[in-house]
């Protein structure tokens, strides 16, 4: 049985870095995938599907749902470890519902917790525009990504809160503090 943890948060919240560090510290038990990495791997393969995905990502838009869900399900099932962290998902109510549906129809994956790394919009903007990592890191695209993140957020929080699965972590502290707390939560919930 794969134990799934979803790590959500605004662009620039640090969710990817946090999850990467936890997986590195616990490489014998935990594996981390960024939804973006899974999709970018497909893009890098140069496949027709990859080219389709690329056009969505380049414009800061969401990749079609069926593509994302199938990519995620496949990655979890093939994961070399039993505890899987995925960051950057779900990003919409539709994604959340489709993921929920997929999990209901899959016996070998259990969603344990959804961890939200909370940061203010000002902190997120400062971090993203200060890091200039790729072509999407300009103001207009940041604003689009922020809007894409915030619009469905309350519905996503409510959905997972009702299941007792939402855990919020303050993302405006040092990376050590954030990672230590998140790691503790994951280990506790996964029973390791």
Swiss-Prot record:
Compartment list: Cytoplasm
Residues reported in the UniProt entry to bind ATP: 12-17, 131, 173
CDD domains according to UniProt: ADK (cd01428)
Record keywords, A-Z: ATP-binding, Cytoplasm, Kinase, Nucleotide biosynthesis, Nucleotide-binding, Transferase
Binding residues annotated for AMP, in chain numbering: 35, 40, 61-63, 88-91, 95, 133, 145
Keyword rRNA-binding: no
Region (LID), start-end ranges: 130-136
Reactions mediated catalytically: AMP + ATP = 2 ADP
GO-annotated cellular components: cytoplasm
Pathway(s) the chain acts in: Purine metabolism; AMP biosynthesis via salvage pathway; AMP from ADP: step 1/1
Subunit and partners: Monomer.
NCBIfam families associated with the record: PRK00279.2-2
Family statement: Belongs to the adenylate kinase family.
Function, as annotated: Catalyzes the reversible transfer of the terminal phosphate group between ATP and AMP. Plays an important role in cellular energy homeostasis and in adenine nucleotide metabolism.
Comment block on domains: Consists of three domains, a large central CORE domain and two small peripheral domains, NMPbind and LID, which undergo movements during catalysis. The LID domain closes over the site of phosphoryl transfer upon ATP binding. Assembling and dissambling the active center during each catalytic cycle provides an effective means to prevent ATP hydrolysis.
Protein name, as recorded: Adenylate kinase
Gene encoding the protein: adk
